[in-house]
Amino acid sequence: MPTATLDGTQVAVNDEGFFESPDQWTEAMAVELARAEGIDELTDQHWQVIHFMRKEYAEKGTGPTVRVLGKTSGVSVKELYELFPKGPAKVAAKIAGIPKPRGCI
């Protein structure tokens, strides 16, 4: 199983870099993950989406799709693509330390 070292801690990840155990995630790790995805600074809106992703995963066992994010996170789909240009659901899930949402390529 692949691993990554984030914030000085070794964590188990899958072949695409998504956490195997979301409980290992910290906000400091999120900052490092965001930088690796080309996001230099996490704004309040980024954190809103990240925390929403983690809440949805905790409640439903999967991260939300872009459509669900746009309708229920308080951030529009257009804003989601501005915040996470490489793909809102996939990149936000990776930064949030949860598995890739179903339906993401």
Which residues does each predicted region cover?
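N-terminal first-folded block
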Residues: A4-E37
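Helix-rich interaction surfaces within compact, conserved domain-sized segments
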Residues: V13, T65-I105
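Gly/Ser/Thr-rich helix-start
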Residues: F18, T62, I98
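A short, ordered amphipathic alpha-helix with a cationic face
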Residues: F18-Q24, K55-A58, V66-R67, E79-L80
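Metallocofactor- and cofactor-centric catalytic cores in central/energy metabolism, strongly enriched
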Residues: A30, R35-R54, A58-E59, V66, ...
